[in-house]
């Protein structure tokens, strides 16, 4: 099943019993978070709050709260286990697009051409009179307080826009970048754009500030896009492919786009059937900025981007289960808000796993596996435990071929995809260990690891600035554990042989099992 927009997806989920409408008044301040958190932990449905207290726009939460709904958003209709397997097919597609194998036969060349044609056929198309511009707020009508923006946790600095799909373009690029960055509401038409320095939006902004210093930087934020476009924004799409093209491949139909209506922002294109679109600029700082509050980190002072308006963001409850530190980020000034009639506001919360980002991480883990295997054929499985905050720990299963092989794989994972740059812990195991079973992983660690020999520590590496365990913000250490069987050269002792029952005995007991009535 393919979905043309968010409403189509909501209808499909409702038909499958995967969405529940909440007709009772529920406040966006804390109450929605508590309700969504309880439902997600129980593996329950997406929630559509029809009557959010104090607001007229319905709120959609827990949209991707199970792996099955993530797979449905990518066009795969299956239960959780089958859905995860199907997501590996999407990873194989991305792997083929990222690094196509050279054709060995004429038949292979034909497949490669077919794939290239499929990508070309999914180039987005621009439409006029799009649904996302049925209603336009401008001037004094622009008031973000009219939207039911959630305040998720008691210690949060204020309301937080969480599922905003941010559209940017660098000065030297033809393709647009789509990224999901949280945004703190600080005024009628002002949001703090929290994008980390290595993310696409921040890179585009810095390049623009260098090339066009003192010029406003155009930005659009999409709320309530179709599921394929949203998931395309969080998937490791190859640089040669736009997220809109990838969404078209998932959907099986070209992504329809609309030009923004605000002068200066109209070079950006947004999904034509989106629910709500915010259009505006990051403006240069006018006059001397106010001094930083006492105890706050210093304002950014280096680089062209430092000359733009910034504000102190946070603290907010984050996917780690803790409140993050405050930090300075650019201010996004909203000039216009466009929307569909009867628009739906899409939101989420982040907190101690499991939360929606953790579920997305479990699903996207399956997309990563073929990408890693393309580069490292010895990797046989890969798992990012959701308890590890989506990316901070990885368990790698491999087919070991020589002494020191596990350490090569550790450094390969850390360096291959940007998504693993902040992975703090990597545990490498053999093929006989199920990476998704903590009992087996701990057994391998406690029986195959000598702490001095098999622990790899790497200092002064990039670390998520939200990681308060690191000694300084953004810089910390990483740890690898080689929990594989050791080869000659790695140990001087005779290595233990795992206990395994005789195959003939197991077969006989299988028959007895039923006869005894134990099954």
From Swiss-Prot:
It is an enzyme of class 4 (lyase). GO terms for cellular component: cytosol; plasma membrane. Its EC number is 4.1.1.98. The keyword Lyase applies. Mn(2+) binds at residues 177, 243. Its main location: membrane. InterPro entries: UbiD (IPR002830), UbiD-like_C (IPR049381), UbiD-like_N (IPR049383), UbiD_bacteria (IPR023677), UbiD_Rift_dom (IPR048304). This is 3-octaprenyl-4-hydroxybenzoate carboxy-lyase. It comes from Burkholderia pseudomallei (strain K96243). The lineage of its organism: Bacteria, Pseudomonadati, Pseudomonadota, Betaproteobacteria, Burkholderiales. The gene is ubiD.
């Amino acid at each position: 099943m393919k979905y043309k927009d968010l409403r189509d997806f909501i209808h499909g989920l409702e038909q499958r019993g995967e969405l529940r409408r909440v007709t009772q008044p529920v406040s966006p301040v804390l109450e929605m978070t508590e309700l969504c958190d309880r439902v997600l932990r129980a593996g329950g449905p997406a929630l559509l709050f029809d009557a959010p207290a104090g607001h007229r726009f319905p709120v959609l939460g827990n949209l991707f709260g199970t792996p099955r709904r993530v797979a449905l958003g990518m066009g795969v209709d299956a239960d959780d286990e089958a859905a995860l397997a199907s997501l590996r097919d999407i990873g194989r597609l991305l792997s083929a697009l990222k690094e196509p194998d050279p054709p060995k036969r004429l038949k292979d060349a034909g497949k490669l051409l077919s794939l290239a044609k499929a990508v070309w056929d999914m180039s987005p198309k621009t439409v006029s009179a799009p649904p996302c511009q049925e209603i336009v707020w401008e001037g004094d009508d622009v008031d973000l307080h009219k939207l039911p923006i959630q305040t998720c946790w008691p210690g949060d600095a204020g309301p937080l826009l969480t599922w905003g799909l941010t559209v940017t373009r660098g000065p030297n690029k033809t393709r647009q970048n789509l990224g999901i960055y949280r945004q703190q509401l600080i005024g009628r038409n002002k949001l703090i754009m929290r994008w980390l320095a290595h993310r696409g939006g921040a890179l585009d902004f810095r390049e623009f500030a260098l090339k066009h210093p003192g010029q406003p930087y155009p930005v659009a934020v999409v709320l309530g896009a179709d599921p394929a476009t949203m998931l395309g924004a969080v998937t490791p799409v190859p640089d040669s492919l736009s997220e809109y093209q990838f969404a078209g491949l998932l959907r099986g139909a070209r992504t329809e786009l609309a030009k923004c209506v605000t002068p200066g922002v109209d070079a950006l294109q947004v999904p034509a059937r989106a629910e709500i679109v915010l259009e505006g600029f990051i403006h240069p700082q006018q006059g001397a900025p106010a001094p930083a509050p006492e105890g706050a980190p210093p304002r950014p002072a280096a680089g062209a981007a430092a000359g733009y308006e910034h504000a102190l963001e946070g603290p907010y409850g984050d996917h780690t289960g803790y409140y993050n530190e405050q930090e300075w980020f650019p201010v996004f000034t909203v000039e216009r808000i466009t929307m569909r009639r009867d628009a739906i506001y899409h939101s989420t919360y982040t907190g101690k796993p499991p939360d929606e980002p953790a579920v997305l991480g479990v699903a996207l883990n399956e997309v990563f596996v073929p990408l890693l295997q393309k580069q490292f054929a010895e990797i046989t499985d890969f798992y990012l435990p959701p308890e590890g905050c989506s990316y901070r720990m990885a368990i790698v299963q491999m087919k070991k071929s020589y002494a020191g092989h596990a350490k090569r794989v550790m450094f390969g994972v850390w360096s291959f995809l940007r998504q693993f740059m902040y992975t703090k812990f990597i545990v490498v195991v053999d093929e006989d260990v199920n990476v998704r079973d903590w009992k087996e992983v701990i057994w391998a660690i406690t029986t195959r690891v000598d702490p001095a020999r098999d622990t790899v520590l790497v200092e002064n590496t990039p670390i998520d600035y939200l990681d308060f365990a690191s000694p300084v913000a953004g810089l910390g250490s990483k740890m690898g554990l080689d929990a594989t069987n050791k080869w000659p050269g790695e140990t001087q002792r005779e290595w233990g042989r795992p206990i395994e029952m005789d195959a003939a005995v197991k077969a006989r007991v299988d028959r007895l099992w039923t006869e005894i009535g134990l099954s």
